[in-house]
Amino acid sequence: RKRPDLPILAVERSNRNDVRVFNMGVDYRGETGNPFWEEMGRKHPKQLVIIPFSSNKETVHFYWNSVGANCITGVYEPFGYTMCETLDRRVPAIVQDIDGPKEICELVMDSVFEYHVDKDFEQDIENFKEAVVRFWDTHPDDRASMANHARTALDGFRPEVIKEEWKKVFSNSEIRAKGQYSLSEIEKRKKQAQQDKGEQLY
């Protein structure tokens, strides 16, 4: 579902020999190895650089500061943690148009490079390549400005904002409850809930 080979194949199809794809977080040097990535390394020695989980923090930090863009390629992302990390680090993002990442950056779509996910993988490679070319054709200063603006997409996920949103949920629930129950019944239900919670803790 992650489709990590998508950027590699797109770069190869572009015929750009000066571009490398870094895959960070692949732990393929364990006891059992990782046949998929070992094969990928053999197939794409010029395009692919693998940064395993076992890398030290300095190495990871170096590559995060060296990459031109982060490619979000999964077809199933319930909540895009990688998307959030990318935005937080102010790294230009090449992102798919699926729920999860799309919902996170929907207010800053003009500041990311979106590509359409197609059921046909060959077309998917082509769509991704088009997004990569748009990234390459964008001036580095504009990329930096876009990445800075894209980070504002995280404002709605900050703890203080989420806390206020939960307050609204509880307040609205109480208002609806007041329309169905008397005040004494609501208080009774609150006390019962607190009592049940106390028994569970005990």
Which residues does each PLM region occupy?
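Short alpha-helical donor nucleotide-sugar binding micro-motif in glycosyltransferases
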Residues: F62-V67
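A conserved mid-protein helix/loop that constitutes part of the nucleotide-sugar donor-binding site
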Residues: R1-R13
